[in-house]
């Protein structure tokens, strides 16, 4: 797979290149780097790039400028936006991006993006790929209002939501946010069948379960992909078993 990383910061390019090279999702990736759109265009002209990691805020340019030009190529690459800003998510998916990852980059999150790219690259026609890429209408986003700002997170990136002492903690694959909301508020926005309540104060993303262990009183302990651990309440065991093949 030929991958182009466009970022005006050399450290960010090197960091992302390192994570891609060490990912289990791609074999022997051929990685190209560019610090501006002009340099990226030269690489795109010479190479048939399969994937571009695209920063949004470049020194004097905007990554969306290049993203909008890619559709003119005979074989446009898939796009993953890689940025320090969390307020461009909706616009990113409007431009048919496969994923949207945040700085500082983490191996697990890069792996998730590459896994999506790998699945899309196995599709045979352009129309298949276009239908598989999330569109604005189908991308589930959740706005979390913090004390100093609001952040937008993708529901699929949420690991769990739990309530303690009147505060709701929402854990994603990258960060944890605490807001003044109830668990019912989150449940009303969580999309089935991915989210399931496993305790009176906890809802988890089923796709983020990494390991299941026996627990006290014939219950279970869920180990999530980000390392968090959540006990399953006895009254929720039946519902969990119905959603999992055990």
UniProtKB/Swiss-Prot annotation:
Residue ranges of every copy of the HTH LytTR-type domain listed in the record: 142-246
CDD domains in the record: REC_LytTR_AlgR-like (cd17532)
GO cellular component annotations of the record: cytoplasm
Gene3D superfamilies: 2.20.25.10, 2.40.50.40, 3.40.50.2300
Domain Response regulatory: 2-118
Keyword tags: Cytoplasm, DNA-binding, Phosphoprotein, Transcription, Transcription regulation, Two-component regulatory system
Record-listed 4-aspartylphosphate modification sites: 55
Subcellular location: Cytoplasm
UniProt PTM comment: Phosphorylated by LytS.
MF-aspect GO terms: DNA binding; phosphorelay response regulator activity
InterPro entries in the cross-refs: CheY-like_superfamily, LytR-like, LytTR_DNA-bd_dom, Sig_transdc_resp-reg_receiver
PANTHER family: STAGE 0 SPORULATION PROTEIN A HOMOLOG, TRANSCRIPTIONAL REGULATOR-RELATED
Role this protein plays: Member of the two-component regulatory system LytR/LytS that probably regulates genes involved in cell wall metabolism.
Protein name: Sensory transduction protein LytR
Species this protein is from: Streptococcus agalactiae serotype V (strain ATCC BAA-611 / 2603 V/R)
């Amino acid at each position: 797979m030929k991958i182009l990383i466009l970022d005006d910061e050399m450290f960010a390019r090197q960091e992302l290149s390192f994570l891609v090279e060490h990912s289990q999702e791609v074999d022997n990736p051929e990685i190209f780097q560019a610090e501006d759109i002009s340099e990226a265009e030269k690489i795109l002209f010479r190479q048939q790039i399969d994937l571009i990691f695209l920063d949004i805020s470049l020194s004097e340019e905007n990554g969306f400028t290049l993203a909008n030009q890619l559709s003119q190529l005979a074989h446009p690459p898939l796009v993953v936006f890689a940025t320090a800003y969390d307020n461009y998510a909706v616009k990113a998916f409007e431009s048919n991006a496969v994923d949207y990852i945040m700085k500082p980059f983490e191996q697990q999150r890069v792996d998730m993006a590459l896994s999506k790219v790998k699945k899309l690259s196995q599709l045979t026609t352009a129309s298949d790929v276009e239908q598989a890429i999330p569109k604005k209408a189908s991308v589930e986003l959740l706005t979390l209002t913090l004390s100093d700002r609001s952040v937008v997170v993708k529901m699929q990136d949420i690991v769990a939501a739990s309530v303690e002492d009147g505060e709701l903690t929402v854990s994603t694959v990258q960060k944890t946010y605490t807001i003044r909301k109830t668990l019912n508020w989150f449940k009303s926005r969580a999309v089935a069948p991915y989210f399931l309540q496993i305790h009176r104060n906890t809802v988890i993303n089923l796709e983020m379960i990494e390991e299941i262990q026996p627990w006290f009183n014939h219950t279970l302990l869920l180990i999530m992909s980000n390392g968090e651990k959540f006990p399953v309440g006895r009254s929720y065991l039946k519902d969990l078993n119905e959603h999992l093949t055990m």
